[in-house]
Amino acid sequence: MRSSVLFSLYAATLVAAVAHPKDPQIVLQESQATIVEPDEYLIELSPGETRWVTEDDKWALRRENINFFDITHNKELGTLNHKLSTESVKFPSKPAHNESIVPLLKELKKENMRTHLETFTSFHTRYYKSHYGAESSAWLLEQVRKTLTDAGASKASVKAFPHPWGQASIIATIPGKSDKTVVIGAHQDSINLFLPSILAAPGADDDGSGTVTILEALRVLLKSEEVLKGEADNTIEFHWYSAEEGGLLGSQAIFQSYEKEGRDVKAMLQQDMTGYVQKTLDAGEPESVGVITDFVHPGLTEFIKKIITVYCDIPYVLTKCGYACSDHASASKAGYPSAFVIESDFKYSDNKIHTTEDKIEYLSFDHMLQHARLTLGLVYELAFAKFK
């Protein structure tokens, strides 16, 4: 019964698309109309395990909480750095910049995150193939640009990293004294896995929360005169990836380009879903930061645990999320040390994601503030770390 109703709805929508090409529900841009999508996509479900699937198959897998790389156009990722050993990257034994970081932590404002997230979730969807996704990306780019301008960050820059599907990724760069680079990431797109091109996807938690969390961390990081003047030992980048929900497409494109360019990325942290704590509290568990332990760099992950202990007001919990579960996996595949933190033990994470109900009202900005503290503490410590 449900399938027949959905088919009727889908058919009616297609008719409406033909009859009313300017209807706001029709999410493909005119400029994208000539893009020819393949009938099937090549996905990687685990190392070496690939499968050809349709787009509907992709969404069906995601509804079953099965993650993957879409490698249809990214088969070269990891082929150049496959012999690169991330074990050679050594992280500090403990945080060493407490005196500089603690005053900065006091500058983080959850009100800023709320204000940004209210606008970011007001787009009907941020689906990467939609004009809404392109518009939300343009809005976010402007917020990042304004953040740099307001800080007087004349040495810093921000650019759109274009993709053929229309929604650009965003990269903000704060040059340091070397090309060794520390990356902080989140994904900007959202999706409704039932009918991505039609249904609303506010994406407050997934990953609007991570998007505004790292934006606020960037704002406060730029209050450091040393960072602002380019005196950090290492270059800092903040990334907002497009099309994570489609199979880590945006981050794959970026890290494939970095791999080809020989970029020296020393660390990458992904902040994906930073705001939901209710299931944790309902289970009688303490509010905590979920530190992912599978398919991540152990040294970087160990250092992140120390950062949480020193700079956050809540503990961490160790948890797992599986293969290709967020954009850090693209960095890892390219041969770069990567890590991932999430709002809780994975079993208590937000089950409203990928639906119309992924709304601000279910989130805790106090919890997001803890993720911002983690982000700020980590990026500052690693910006001044003495990597070989």
UniProtKB/Swiss-Prot annotation:
Name of the top EC class for this enzyme: hydrolase
A GO-annotated cellular component: extracellular region
Residues carrying covalently attached carbohydrate according to the record: 98
GO terms under biological process: proteolysis
Pro-sequence residue ranges: 20-88
Function per UniProt: Extracellular aminopeptidase that allows assimilation of proteinaceous substrates.
Protein name stated in the entry: Leucine aminopeptidase 1
Species whose genome carries this gene: Leptosphaeria maculans (strain JN3 / isolate v23.1.3 / race Av1-4-5-6-7-8)
